[in-house]
Structure formats: structure tokens, C-alpha cells
Design a protein with these regions (language model features):
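C-terminal accessory/tail domains of diverse enzymes
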Residues: 2-128, 144, 148-311
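Short glycine-rich beta-strand segments
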Residues: 140-142
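His-enriched metal-coordination microenvironments in redox/metal-binding proteins
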Residues: 134
Length: 311
């Protein structure tokens, strides 16, 4: 408990935007290669903890390692678990491509779990990342509240600064097949929600699941793997699991602060899209994502909501 409190204090001091972090549910997926494991066809791509032979860098066995970091690794999708990831190349092969997937997390205590998960991965011998690896963040939304208008507002926020995301994020993510820029008809997307009518919601769904956006009708049989999900802003996840997924970011292992900043920043975008515009403080030495928030506020005409701290 003391360790968690120390991490919370560190995060609060390190990330000023954490004061606006809400209890909205979120989840993360961290891709990498180099995990030694075996997988049976009946495992449904879930890597059972007892099927992992990797050890800690200091020689501890795998089970002891995740217990020490208080990351309860399990064998189903309702807990922290590992899955095989065929999109991860890992020095030209996919044999050991994998990802660590979180359960549903909430608030600062969830952020502490995510922080510890990265520390846990950093201590596994042989784990590494390359350009084929990504770091994905899901933020939960209630479809009764987060409707056509909020989806529209989110696209309105993200689309003008999408290029900026790709510039700020390490690696050449813009050209990656798994996190492409928006390919929907954005102007049409922003023009269909004049009311909360069912007609507007149907139209926005049609615009997402279009051939232009790489929709494949055959994939409807396997909705989890719908091809429209391979965009930096994945709205397929909205209809599939009631989350908004941000896939822009490259994989993160050692630079844990970068991962924390991205989680906080992307949640803030969701809150903005729901009309939550808090007063925020101006910090001259703000990190790149807080600076991006300042830029968004200025573009939206919310300059008066940026408060300068007294000297």
C-alpha cells in the first residue's frame, strides 16, 4: 500500500493533468516480443502463466516476478493476461510476438496498476520492442450518453491535429498498417448529427463501416477483427465493446512516463468531446501532451480557461 501511495504522489507531481483524471474505465494493451511461451490451439490465443518460461533479469521465476509487482496474471480476459500477437514481427519472426492486456481499470489506482505493469515487463529477460509493436489505450464510454454528437465532436477534435500526433509519437507510426490516419469522409461525418435521431446514428455507422474505410463485409462474422479497427482512432471499438481505442502510439517499455502521459491525455480528449472543459493551469515546462491540450484550447476558443500560476 505504501508503495502504491508513493507512486501516486510521484505521478501527481510528475503529471499536472492528473488532477483532471476521472474514474472513467480504461484499459491498455502493450505489444512486444521475446517472451518465451508455448501455446495450444485450445487456448484461444491466451498465454497461460504456467506456459511461460521467461525469467526475470535477476533470475527470479516468472510467477515470483509478477507477484512482486502485484500484477495478478491470469488465464482469461477479465484479468491481466498475455495473448499471442501475430502482428508483432520481432526481428523478422512472429514466434514470440505477444501483448500484455489489462482488465478494466479506473482512476488513479488503475493508473498505478498500469505503471506497475510496465515496470514488471521491463524486468523480464529478453523482452524487447520494435516498429511493429504498439501501445493501445481504450477508454470506456456509455453509448446512452456518448452518442452520435460526441463521436462527431471527438473526430472534430482529433482530425485537425492527427498529423501532430504522428510527429510527437516516436517511430514512423503514420505508415504502420495497424494505426492509419482517418480514412472516413470526415466532412460527411461532421455533418450527419444535427439531432440525436436514430437516422443520424445510422448514418455515422454507415460512414465508419464503408469500403473507403476498409470495411470488409466478410469480417462481420468475426467482429473483433474488423479491418476498420486499424486506424489511430478506432471507432469500431465503440460499437464492438463500448470503448474508444487510441492506437496511434508506438510501443513503450522503459519510458513509462511517456505511457502515463498518453493515457492521461487521451482520456482528456474523451472528456472534451463530452463538453467537459475544465480550467487548466499553464505550466511553462509542460510535457508535449499538455502543450497539445493548450493548443486545442486555443483552437476551440477556450484561452480564458488556461490559468497562469502566480509567481
Amino acid at each position: 500500500m505504501a508503495l502504491s501511495q508513493n507512486i501516486i504522489l510521484r505521478l501527481m507531481n510528475r503529471f499536472p493533468m492528473l488532477q483532471y483524471f476521472t474514474d472513467r474505465p480504461f484499459g491498455i494493451e502493450i505489444e512486444f516480443y521475446g517472451l518465451d511461451y508455448v501455446l495450444a490451439p485450445i487456448d484461444n490465443n491466451i498465454i497461460k502463466p504456467y506456459c511461460i518460461s521467461s525469467r526475470a533479469k535477476d533470475g527470479r521465476n516468472f510467477q515470483q516476478l509478477y507477484k512482486d509487482f502485484k500484477i495478478p496474471i491470469g488465464a482469461d480476459r477479465d484479468c491481466w493476461h498475455f495473448e499471442k500477437d501475430g502482428s508483432v514481427r520481432g526481428k523478422g519472426h512472429t514466434q514470440f510476438g505477444a501483448e500484455l492486456i489489462s482488465p478494466i481499470l479506473r482512476g488513479i489506482t488503475g493508473l498505478v496498476q498500469a505503471y506497475n505493469a510496465f515496470r514488471f515487463l521491463c524486468n523480464i529477460q529478453g523482452l524487447n520492442i520494435d516498429d511493429s509493436c504498439g501501445f493501445h489505450v481504450h477508454h470506456g464510454v456509455d453509448s446512452k450518453v456518448f452518442t452520435c454528437k460526441q463521436l462527431q465532436e471527438l473526430v472534430r477534435l482529433v482530425y485537425p491535429i492527427e498529423e501532430y500526433f504522428y510527429l510527437l509519437i516516436p517511430g514512423n507510426r503514420k505508415n504502420a498498417e495497424t494505426c492509419k490516419p482517418m480514412e472516413i469522409d470526415v466532412m460527411a461525418f461532421l455533418d450527419v448529427c444535427d439531432s440525436e435521431s436514430e437516422k443520424g446514428s445510422d448514418k455515422i455507422t454507415q460512414l465508419w463501416y464503408s469500403l473507403e474505410n476498409h470495411y470488409d463485409p466478410k469480417s462481420a462474422r468475426y467482429p473483433r477483427y474488423d479491418k476498420t479497427r486499424y486506424h489511430g482512432l478506432n471507432l469500431h471499438s465503440y460499437w464492438y465493446r463500448s470503448t474508444i481505442e487510441f492506437r496511434y502510439h508506438s510501443a513503450v517499455l522503459n519510458n513509462i512516463d511517456e505511457a502515463m502521459e498518453w493515457i492521461i491525455f487521451t482520456q482528456f480528449l474523451i472528456e472534451l468531446s463530452q463538453g467537459h472543459v475544465p480550467n487548466i493551469c499553464f505550466y511553462p515546462e509542460a510535457n508535449k501532451w499538455l502543450n497539445t491540450i493548450y493548443m486545442i484550447y486555443e483552437k476551440l476558443g477556450h484561452e480564458n480557461c488556461i490559468k497562469r500560476l502566480a509567481n
